[in-house]
Amino acid sequence: MTAIPTPYEDLLRTIRDEGAHKDDRTGTGTTSLFGQQIRYNLQEGFPLLTTKKVHFHSVVGELLWFLRGDSNVRWLQDNNIRIWNEWADEDGELGPVYGVQWRSWPTPDGRHIDQISRALEMLKNNPDSRRNIVSAWNVSELENMALPPCHLLFQLYVADGKLSCQLYQRSADMFLGVPFNIASYALLTHMFAQQADLEVGEFIWTGGDCHIYDNHTEQVDEQLSRAARPYPTLELNKAASLFDYTFEDIAVSNYDPHPLIRGKVAV
């Protein structure tokens, strides 16, 4: 039987065993390594972790919310997703966070750039471009964001008819956040590929400060004691456009994870 690749779990173990102890903004404390990378071949399954259950409905909903260009948590709440509640103000606003920058990056002359539409257009018309980058790190608006972007930039790359995506994440909560981010950007890669009539290639995750919070150490030990199971298969109905996907278009089959492991979010 072919061994199941476990690049996330391998990195999690390395950070646990070899990381440096650091203080952090939240006051929780972390064990951390800098400048790490994980690679997944998207042809070999959808990288939704099996060593613990990942709430795929929330992964899908957050990505659809980003693609809407939304900055308010109400749409998420209406779809039973509460992962952004801790950072929202009393009106549900988060400021010009991910979706706003993706879909409506402001220019000095008052225009707005739809980076997602531009990225898809480039895949179709100039797939060999080395400039196909989407950034959420708008320095001029960071102070107005409830939380500066952690996963802040991704680049798209086409070779042999296959689309690969590399994400850079400056701050990586390895236990809670990163499993979610891996699934989200893998899904986005599939969506871009489908809309551009490409196959999927690799998803490459690159992390800056890759950390395990001190209050997640027992959960990490539990997760690393579990044997990985086969990855599920993504079922993706082709929508009329990249912005027309709904929950009903996106599902995973044969997802058989170990049970959920809960952990407290550091705010």
Curated annotation (Swiss-Prot):
The highest taxon in the source lineage is Bacteria
Question: Which Enzyme Commission number(s) are listed?
Answer: 2.1.1.45
Tell me the GO BP annotations in alphabetical order. Answer: dTMP biosynthetic process; dTTP biosynthetic process; methylation
**A GO molecular function for this record?**
thymidylate synthase activity
Which UniProt keywords are present, listed alphabetically? Cytoplasm, Methyltransferase, Nucleotide biosynthesis, Transferase
Where does it reside? Cytoplasm
One GO cellular component term, please give it: cytosol
Record flagged with keyword Heme: no
In what pathway does it function? Pyrimidine metabolism; dTTP biosynthesis
Where, in this chain's numbering, is (6R)-5,10-methylene-5,6,7,8-tetrahydrofolate bound?
Answer: H55, D173, A266
Q: Which residues form the active site?
A: C150 (nucleophile)
Q: Which InterPro entries match?
A: Thymidate_synth/dCMP_Mease, Thymidate_synth/dCMP_Mease_dom, Thymidate_synth/dCMP_Mease_sf, Thymidylate_synthase, Thymidylate_synthase_AS
Residues binding dUMP: R25, R130, R131, R170, S171, A172, D173, N181, H211, I212, Y213
* Pfam families according to UniProt: Thymidylat_synt
The record describes the protein's role as: Catalyzes the reductive methylation of 2'-deoxyuridine-5'-monophosphate (dUMP) to 2'-deoxythymidine-5'-monophosphate (dTMP) while utilizing 5,10-methylenetetrahydrofolate (mTHF) as the methyl donor and reductant in the reaction, yielding dihydrofolate (DHF) as a by-product. This enzymatic reaction provides an intracellular de novo source of dTMP, an essential precursor for DNA biosynthesis.
Q: Which NCBIfam families match?
A: PRK01827.1-3, PRK01827.1-5, thym_sym
Protein name per UniProt: Thymidylate synthase
